[in-house]
């Protein structure tokens, strides 16, 4: 669960980084989109305004063209009338010579009409040229409008592409919410697991205190068989399935409870194995410590003659059993060294406490190869290394033991080797 939690936290950090990057890119894309949309709006407004002006100019030019056509037609009619009048032979009139004033007036009128006609023709030519230029401009504008219309779907696609990061942002938000929900579930599971561990630890502690109380009681009338029976592990009661579980939901809940109980028992066994290994290493260190002292010996470290190595005639299992017995005796000897300070704390005159077994009993138990109960208040002759230790206040190792003994005075009468040493010995025998 912790690995999943770390993985979810890493994924959450990566998602947050991606989310920030996407937010920044989304802001940039939105700014570009807004600028491009404003640019398009401005271009459209300008083109629409120009188209309106051009359409107004075209309408005015059309009106002027119609008016000019009407005037040209009128002048052409008048000119044709004048030509006809000039081409028709004059009726015979009485020989009367027209006056020069009338002739001059007619000539002036003819010149004026010809000049007006010429000016109208030139004006029409200019208008036609302007119309051609306007037509070319209109074609260009139509082509540009077509290009703009062709670009519109591309722009719409681009706007859709710009809107895609927003959708991805929403998806990331949903993923982030799911990750937060998963993290909350993991926290709830961790809290539940912690509560179950505490409950299992409390139950285990109660069982261990019960075992310690049973082991603290002296064995009566059974000898080596009683010690062997106490050294072996008690079989665990198998969980019984209740008979009233008929529904599937109740059965599934019961099976889940059994699985959780099995997981917790495995965790407790792992912790016990680690603690056993630590205690064994500590026992070995305390066995080797008095040997390395000047004047110390292996007999002082392991009273009762414990052998750690199997002889040439022994098998592998016998060697292991002998090594286990030697380790147990070493642990008992170490605790005997500490019991001296307990005796000095309670009995200043080094009087043996009542109910303590003799050293011969320890030797006999070691010969059997099975140590079930070793008293910490045995009267053991101090070796040269222990003689230099003095009072419990001079030894920092013994001070917490004496303090614990003073805080719990009930343990002084029959202090035993802890239960985990005897739980470890049957494993060594197997």
From Swiss-Prot:
Keywords: Coiled coil
Keyword RNA-binding carried by entry: no
Entry-linked InterPro entries: GM130_C, GOLGA_cons_dom, Golgin_A
Taxonomy, superkingdom: Eukaryota
Residues covered by region (Disordered): 138-158, 217-239, 290-331, 382-406
Bias type Gly residues, positions: 303-316
Comp. bias (Basic and acidic residues): 222-235
Coiled-coil boundaries: 2-217
GO cellular component: cis-Golgi network; Golgi cis cisterna; Golgi cisterna membrane
Any one GO biological process: Golgi organization
Family recorded in the similarity comment: Belongs to the GOLGA8 family.
PANTHER family: GOLGIN SUBFAMILY A MEMBER 8C-RELATED, GOLGIN SUBFAMILY A MEMBER-RELATED
Protein name in the entry: Putative golgin subfamily A member 8D
Organism whose genome encodes this protein: Homo sapiens
Source organism phylogeny: Eukaryota, Metazoa, Chordata, Craniata, Vertebrata
Gene from which the chain derives: GOLGA8DP
